């Protein structure tokens, strides 16, 4: 097992107060039911950012301030800000620089990272590398998503799945043996069109046809995504445990990406971890993309499921396809 380079010094989450239940879909003309959604996804409700000021950067700032407070860090100490999002507030410049301005982190380098639901773990891995290289000592890594702005609210297959929220971590150099014990990242671009936003980018910019065809919204081939998600999450679990030279019995808590309860259960089964050692909050938040793992980790700490010295396994998959995992000693 390697000696950790970087430790997660503070975690925080920021979620909008507005709750949308499964029953609420009837009010917007979606033919579905609580039972139908729960049976297929395990989702009962999700948070929706409906107020004008509740942007991706706003939620990121809410989570970041809590993480910074818990880490005992002020904005002037932050060297780098890495913000993972699939729902940036605008295409140019990055949402990270808006977050930087909101926090007053004037000496930080700030940039966005795009790896969909795996993005927060990608960000932690990049941050660990910056600390190892001596390029930074204190890094803010955020996953923030306003998924409600990029889903088609007339498409039952996608709009019931997603929610809004943000999670953040302050990373610092490890000095006591706690921190990241292993990390793993993979991608397979041949699967990109299983889960994607077809148009609205540089290849096919926004125009009347894009808007009328609603092709700027998330499209998903659900069955194929499920199959590849289970396979990639299993690979990620194995690689993280092997990298840390640990077994499932050494893990205090498994925190998988909160996409779908069936994927979570399949991941736990492959990892040989009982569901009593798996953190689940997909029922209350839905799929918040790259924010899901930091939100879950923050709640797990808050609920006393894990604490200082606990060993957690984090594992994610997302559009791209991307997948990633990490073993962390808190």
Spans of features found by a protein language model:
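Catalytic phosphate/nucleotide-handling subdomain of diverse soluble enzymes
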Residues: 295-315, 321-330
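Conserved beta-ketoacyl condensing-enzyme motif
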Residues: 8-10, 52-117, 121, 241-268
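Beta-strand segments within the central parallel beta-sheet cores of soluble alpha/beta enzyme folds
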Residues: 37, 76-84, 111-114, 136-144, ...
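Condensing-enzyme catalytic core mediating Claisen C-C bond formation in acyl metabolism
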Residues: 1-51, 155-227, 231, 235, ...
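A contiguous, well-structured pocket-lining segment that forms one wall/lid of small-molecule binding clefts
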Residues: 209-282
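Conserved catalytic cysteine-centered active-site region
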Residues: 34-58, 86-139, 268-297
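Acidic, glycine-rich active-site loops and adjacent beta-strand->loop/helix elements
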Residues: 14, 84-89, 115-120, 143-148, ...
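Flexible, glycine-rich active-site loops centered on histidine and acidic residues
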Residues: 132-166
């Amino acid at each position: 097992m390697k000696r950790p380079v970087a430790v997660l010094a503070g975690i925080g989450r920021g979620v909008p107060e507005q709750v949308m239940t499964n029953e609420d879909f009837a009010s917007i003309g979606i033919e579905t039911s609580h039972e139908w959604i729960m049976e297929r996804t395990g989702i009962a409700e999700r948070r929706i950012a409906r107020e004008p000021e509740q942007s991706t950067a706003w939620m990121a700032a809410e989570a970041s301030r809590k993480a910074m407070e818990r880490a005992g860090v002020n904005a002037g100490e932050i060297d780098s800000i890495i913000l993972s999002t699939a729902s940036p507030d605008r295409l140019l410049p990055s949402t990270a620089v808006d977050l930087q301005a909101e926090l007053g982190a004037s000496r930080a380098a700030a940039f966005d990272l795009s790896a969909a639901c795996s993005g927060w773990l990608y960000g932690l891995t990049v941050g660990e590398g910056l600390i190892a290289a001596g390029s930074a000592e204190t890094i803010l890594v955020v996953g923030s998503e306003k998924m409600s702005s990029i889903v088609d609210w007339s498409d039952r297959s996608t709009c019931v799945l997603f929610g809004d929220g943000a999670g953040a971590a302050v990373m610092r150099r490890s000095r006591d043996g706690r921190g990241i014990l292993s990390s793993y990242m993979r991608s397979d671009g041949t699967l990109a069109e299983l889960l994607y936003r077809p148009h609205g980018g540089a290849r096919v910019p926004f125009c009347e046809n894009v808007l009328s065809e609603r092709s700027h919204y998330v499209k998903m081939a659900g069955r194929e995504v499920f199959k590849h998600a289970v396979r990639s999450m299993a690979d990620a679990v194995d690689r993280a445990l092997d990298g840390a030279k640990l077994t499932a019995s050494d893990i205090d808590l498994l925190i998988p990406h909160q996409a779908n309860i069936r994927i979570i259960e399949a991941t736990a089964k492959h990892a040989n971890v009982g569901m009593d050692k798996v953190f689940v909050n997909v029922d209350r938040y839905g799929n918040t993309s790259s924010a899901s793992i930091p939100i879950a980790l923050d709640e797990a700490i808050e609920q006393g499921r894990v604490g200082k010295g606990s060993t957690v396994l984090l594992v994610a998959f997302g559009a791209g396809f991307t997948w990633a995992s990490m073993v962390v000693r808190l």
